[in-house]
């Protein structure tokens, strides 16, 4: 007997107006191109069920058993750190990134690593045949009897295969290629992505299966499709980096089961992605000693201190308005710091072009990088280099004061481990904590004092 086809409707994303057919302009709010297709909920789906498939009921929170479910470690410490200690069974993880950055490579390697823990993994590809996936696996030198590969884009066929294989983990590569047969729009459309993600989320919760889904990104770098996609999943990971460079950075921008401040570093090689155990050495290995405009900051990425080089190039402008550019550092932060240098130190920067960069493709957004940015700008402006063994840590206030930062001891220890002998920190961070041997800690109260000591006349 043929399966009854579920009816669809069109809903305005601006005001919620519903229509039986698509319209270019919503008659209720007069917005254009806001009508998207959605499935009419069946009578069965209107009943409330919990994640086990049983009827749901309200329960006092004091009567709910407090059980911390064990995470599954992936044998990839960098990924475990970003996920908060491992994969949570029943969770749904969205992995986004530019084309060719290595999303599929990462997940295929993760799948193989999970099979080493006697877990069954189903890798579903909507972009490659099973033979193509096998060729990629051979290049990456990954294999395993518990790694199942399936090439399909029909969501119902995917659900049947999951029920048959009964995996512990599922990878969907990618969500934009999967389609729901009851939705008439093309795969990758707003309605298809929403319905397919909702169905996969139900599978993850009801069967306690961890599901990784790959998401395409737009040219602006955001996950393609409705913003609802990122709201529905438990964790959103972004894989960043330049395709023409070897290093990749994995960040969590949403994580219901851990911190969103952690960062994992990988290096792309012929055999796939290799973890970088000490990223500070990587980011500093090509630093040119004795160059003006170059400073080093000890930045915290979650619980890990990372040393990053900050480069500044300040030169007289050839046009009426000075140009400002920043890569890896917030543009507004750069403008604020340069304004403080003009007002509190007297640097004439209004007729100077300024270009700043965090080396290695890292994005720095914490306040502790302010002092290093300010010193690098002043160093380039005066064409006077700092010592190659100097490190700068501190937040810069609008009145020119250097404000205290968190976890100063960890930052100083990381800098000392890599051979930095003189470390500038806020005066208020000086205390009873242990200073590493052969390291001079310089406490400064203002940016003027810091520049006098770092760039003496």
Swiss-Prot record:
Keywords: ATP-binding, DNA damage, DNA repair, DNA-binding, Hydrolase, Metal-binding, Nucleotide-binding, Stress response, Zinc, Zinc-finger. One of its GO terms (cellular component) is cytosol. This is DNA repair protein RadA. Its EC number is 3.6.4.-. Has a putative N-terminal zinc-finger, a middle region with homology to RecA with ATPase motifs including the RadA KNRFG motif, while the C-terminus is homologous to Lon protease. SUPFAM superfamilies: P-loop containing nucleoside triphosphate hydrolases, Ribosomal protein S5 domain 2-like. A zinc finger (C4-type) spans 12-29. ATP binds at residues 97-104.
